[in-house]
Amino acid sequence: MTTRPLRYFAIAVFSASLGLAATIPRTADGKPNLSGVWQGGGVSLYGDAADGTQRTYAAPVNPPPKREPIPYQAWAEAKSKTFTSADDPTLRCLLAGVPRITSMPMPFEIIQTPKEVVIAYESFHAFRIIPINDKLQHPNDLVPTWMGDSVARWDGDALVVDVTGFNDKTWLSGTGSIHSEGLHVVERFQLNSDDTITYSATVTDPKVLTKAWTTGALLRRPPNTRVEEYECIENNQDVQHMEVKK
Amino acid sequence: MKIPIRNRLLIACSGLILSALPVLAHHSFAAEYESKSLVTVTGVITKVEWTNPHIYFYVDAKDASGNVVNWAVEGYPPNTLKRTGFTRDDLKIGDTVTVTAYKAKDSSSRLAGREVTFPDGSKKFAGPAGGAAPPTDAK
């Protein structure tokens, strides 16, 4: 026979588990349902309308990790400083890479199935088809690419995405945030009860960094938004403007 | 079932860590424009490019010497504008508009548009605020 405190504890645990289930949407197989249109920020998530009113939000229940400076090795730090914003690959409409793509001020849609998760980004028409594979096994024929190769597994309620196979042409975040082909990114997508996703990305690159670097974002659902076409090169005068400045 | 209020109370920060976003979505605003001083231009729209990665519209306005300058006004990408309620049909060739904007650092006749006042007096934002604090002469 259980004692009263133990019984209360068991009831509390049971209630908490029910509460978790009730507060986030789940798929038929019980996983958090990440599907939908999300955005990491920008233009106040479309509240900056005619009168300049910006949307405001309650504090998130699960804030993302605080971003620290990138821990570069000395040579890499020096090299990083040789770049200006005119060198930004995205200025030329090139793919933003991971994790930077998540910070672009444009929406993306997550389409989740039991076997794979697809992310379709408005920015630069990027897409990722991410197989769910508990061993996080990448193909053995990878050649370096802008967005790398992604595989995922569920860690409890968090979707963990392992990304490797990058080229060395993207930036991690701001101006000059270089990396090597040894870049390895581990992302976590955690759906929260306040209808946000806490996104974090842990970046390792032993050739360039002294230790792992973590960044993150709080993803929200921009209202009345669908992912649309963004043909960046269409009228891209920015390279010319920025090169005049350089 | 209640959202855990306790967690909310414990959290002080607002969460957007990736806040150092390129303000014009695609390139560095601060590198290209004088981000702390606004200018106001009133003139006639001569051309509209509702294009990516940024829209441009062109406005004929007289400078202090009475010479007509054709200003190129850059704004957000079309999708972004549409989502804030600024549509392609809002910019009509021949309309007289007033634009508050930031001048290009290279002294060209390019502007980063901020607020547009249309012929009926209504106002919409074409692009971002440049400085950390909203300029006092923005209206």
Show which residues each predicted segment covers.
Chain A
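Bacterial N-terminal signal peptides that target proteins for export
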Residues: M1-F14
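PEST-like low-complexity, intrinsically disordered acidic/proline/serine-rich tracts
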Residues: T2, L20-K246
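Hydrophobic core
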Residues: F14-L20
